[in-house]
Amino acid sequence: MMTYQEIFNEIKNKAYFKNHRHVLIAVSGGVDSMNLLHFLYLFQDKLKIRIGIAHVNHKQRSESDSEEAYLKCWAKKHDIPIYVSNFEGIFSEKAARDWRYAFFKSIMLKNNYSALVTAHHSDDQAETILMRLIRGSRLRHLSGIKSVQPFANGQLIRPFLTFSKKDLPEIFHFEDSSNRELSFLRNRVRNNYLPLLKQENPRFIQGLNQLALENSLLFQAFKELTNHITTTDLTEFNEQSKSIQYFLLQDYLEGFPDLDLKKSQFTQLLQIIQTAKQGYYYLKKDYYIFIDKFSFKITKIVPKTELVKEEKMLEYDSNLCYRDYYFSFMPKSNEDQGQVSIPLFSLSSIKLRSRQSGDYISFGHFSKKIRRLFIDEKFTIAERQNAIIGEQDEQIIFVLIGNKTYLRKACKHDIMLAKLYIDKLEKG
């Protein structure tokens, strides 16, 4: 068992709170979180932080309300702000966890806390690794939980992660009787499986934590060795061996945490990319992948309502920015080869929008569907997605796509009244 001073001496050089002034502590009332609360309360001046308490009453035990009342009383006595939420809905481990972290996130955002602090320790880490092994998780997910990671508008910090449960001091806390219920996998791991495995190897927990560390280092090394590869570039991707492609795609999917593909879905996705057949392929949870001649990209599907909202109206003699372009009725003073000018035969407002089904543009003696124009000119899917349609008086007067502009052919008796000028915005 360690004292709080000894714990402080070990973590002070890790500078967990260097960039934080207001931190929110997740407190259940159990021994771990009560230790965290007392520790941060005692050392908040040395750490240069101010603390707040977040507590979720899961309403699953008769003692829950008295535990909530105790924490409110403690917070009032020590002049610490406290935020409480009551769980609603059908209870499960996952539902409760999702509720807690959604609540913590909302409190951080509303009250300007830049860090959430939880009391996870090395025993929790070992339990998590063993649970993931039992569930058949990917190798990547055996890296365990991190001491610091992004969360909400700031970070999630676990300062006790390098300490074991037996390192924490004895302190007043509440015993959660549900921690003994074997209907929950974590409780079976904690109360049944780990004790048996520790009989075979007393250092089994340390072994699991070392596995998590080495696994984390392995994937960090892979990232560093492949950071010169543009994963979404089909030429570069297909130049790699099958094994490297496998982990490059896993790395790329880390950017879409809510996509959560099953192993069979991942294998199917990898095969789609390897064959590089152009088109759209729907995945799940409103995500799809589209592949063109040169690259692939995973994107969340934009609802039709959002596409409608994306439309903008440009009034004569005004200006606006739309997507990556600046639209105005005044030319630049200097000669700019990059500026596009469009003759206007009407001064009515111009609608800027995306392509819609059935769109066509008149080229004088003939008209052409814009969909067919895109196909014939061999524009990539990404370029088609970003094309801008200019519509005036219910006619399409221009199409802006890639580095090209297509104009409606003027009629014989049209008189030019003005010009519209388009400039590509520089990305800083």
Swiss-Prot record:
Catalytic activity: cytidine(34) in tRNA(Ile2) + L-lysine + ATP = lysidine(34) in tRNA(Ile2) + AMP + diphosphate + H(+)
UniProt-annotated binding residues for ATP: S28, G29, G30, V31, D32, S33
InterPro entries reported for this sequence: Lysidine-tRNA-synth_C, Rossmann-like_a/b/a_fold, TilS/TtcA_N, tRNA_Ile_lys_synt, tRNA_Ile_lys_synt_N
GO annotation, biological process: tRNA modification
The EC number(s) this enzyme carries: 6.3.4.19
Predominant localisation class: cytoplasm
GO molecular function, a single term: ATP binding
Localization of this protein: Cytoplasm
Alphabetical keyword list: ATP-binding, Cytoplasm, Ligase, Nucleotide-binding, tRNA processing
GO cellular component, as recorded: cytoplasm
Purpose of the protein: Ligates lysine onto the cytidine present at position 34 of the AUA codon-specific tRNA(Ile) that contains the anticodon CAU, in an ATP-dependent manner. Cytidine is converted to lysidine, thus changing the amino acid specificity of the tRNA from methionine to isoleucine.
Comment on protein domains: The N-terminal region contains the highly conserved SGGXDS motif, predicted to be a P-loop motif involved in ATP binding.
Family the entry assigns: Belongs to the tRNA(Ile)-lysidine synthase family.
Protein name: tRNA(Ile)-lysidine synthase
Organism name: Streptococcus pyogenes serotype M1
